[in-house]
Amino acid sequence: MLKKLNLLLFALLTQLSFSQNSEKCITTKLVNESVTEDVRNYIATEEIATKNNKWRAENSNSVKETIIVPIVVHIVHKNTHVNVGSGTNISDAQIEDAIRILNQDFSKTNIEFPNPPRNTFLNLAADVQIQFCFATTDENGNPTNGITRTSTTKSDWDPDTEANDMKRNNTGGKDGWDPEEYLNIWVCDLYAPPQGGMTLGYSYLPGSVTWSMWKDGLVVDYRYFGTIGVSAPSNDGSTPTHEIGHYLGLMHTFCEEIDGNGNPICCDNDDNNWGGYVDDTPASKDVYWGTVNASTNNNTCNDLSYSNNFNTNVLDMDENFMSYSSDVWMFTHEQSSVMNGTMNGYRSSLKNSPASVNCTGTVGIDNLLDNNQIRIYPNPTKGRVLIQNLMQIPNNSIIVRNILGEIILTSNSRNSLVSLDLSHLENGVYFIDVSSNNGIRIEKVILAK
C-alpha cells in the first residue's frame, strides 16, 4: 500500500536534488515519515483527501461564509531571554503583526493587491475567507490572550531530529491545546546549519498525524514570524501562510520528483488525490528561490502536456504562497476550495470550536473578564442575546462587530441584564465586546435564524 506514496509524489526529501536551501519547509519529509511509520496515518490521510474532494464537488456553487479559527501561539524561548521582546521571547507586537499578515494573505487584502508586481494570474487569485483569531478562553474556560510563553534550557531545535520536541512539556517545550478546538502555533529557535539552508517552518497534512494528534499544528522559526525584527530574504511574513496551507490540505506547487539520475523533472505536484486535484496551478520543475515581478518569466514545463485548466502554455506561478519564491502573494480559487473543504470536513471542529476569540489583536490577560463576571447567552442564537452582569460591574460598554471588525451595534447599560436584538442581521458569526472599568470580554456568537 505504501508504494502508492510515489504516485502521490511524497518522495523523501533526502532523495530530491534540491539545493542547500531546500529545507525551507520540511512538511513533505515529515508527512512521509509519519505515514510510513504508522500505516493508519496513511489510510486516514487518503480517506480524508477523498472525502474533501467529494465535498468540493458537491459544494462547488455554494456561497461561502468566512470561517473563524481560534489560534494559540506558543512562544518557546531560551531561558536567557527573560524579558518579552528579547531574542527568542518575541514581543506581542511581533506576534500580532504575524497574524495580521496571515489574515491579509487569506483574505486577498495583502499589500500586493489590487495591483500585484505582475498580473499574470490576477484572475486566479482568491479570497479564501478563513480568518485566524486569538483565543480568549483556554481549554478550561479561563481567560487568555491567545499567547503562552515557556522558558526552556534548549538552545535551539533541530528539525531533522527534534521536529516535535517543542510540542511537549517533557522535552523542553510546551504541550499544545486541544487540536480539535485550537490551531496550535509553536514559535521557537530552529537550528540554522552553518552552511545555510535552515528550515523556516513546517506542519502536517490533514490526517497525517491522526494517531498522534499532539503533533498537529505548525512550527515557525522566530526569525520568520511576522515582519518585525525578522530576517531576509523570507521577511515578507508569509511563512505561517505557507505552513497553514499545508495544514489545510495544500501541497507545494513545484515538482518534488526526480529522474533516475537525480535531476528535477516536470510534474503537476498538486494534481492528485492528496493535493486536491488543483488544476489552476501550472506544472513547474524544481524550486525557484528568487523574487517575482513583471519581468519574471520562468516557464519550466509545457502545461499543454498536463490535464489542467490552462489551454495554453503559461508561466510558472512563482507568486503562489505554496512556492519557495522570496516574495509571494496569492492562493488560487481551487486552492481556496481545498482549504474550505478541509474546514468543513476534517477540521470542522475548529470551525465549530466553543473557544471565545478576539479578532482585533491581543488583549492583556489581566484585563479579561471571565464567565463568573459576564455571561453571554444563548449561543448560537436565533436573534436575541442576553448579557448578564454577574458582578454588578459598572459602566458597561457593549459593541457588536461583524467578522470584518466593523461596528454593527453599540449599547451602554448599567443594568444587570441586557437584551440585544440581532434578528435584523444576516446569519453568520459576530463578536460581542463587553468592556468596563474592570476589563473586557469578547465572545464569538453564531446567529442562526
Language-model segments: which ranges?
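Sec-dependent signal peptide recognition
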Residues: 3-10
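Fold-level signature of zinc-dependent metallopeptidase catalytic domains
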Residues: 55-103, 187-192
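Solvent-exposed, polar/charged alpha-helical surfaces in well-ordered, non-transmembrane soluble domains
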Residues: 93-100, 104, 238, 320, ...
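A recurrent domain-boundary module in secreted/ectodomain proteins
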Residues: 332-367
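C-terminal outer-membrane/trafficking sorting elements
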Residues: 368-449
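N-terminal zymogen propeptides
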Residues: 20-66, 106
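Hydrophobic h-region of N-terminal signal peptides that target proteins for export
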Residues: 10-18
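Metzincin-family zinc-dependent endopeptidase catalytic domain
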Residues: 100-294, 298
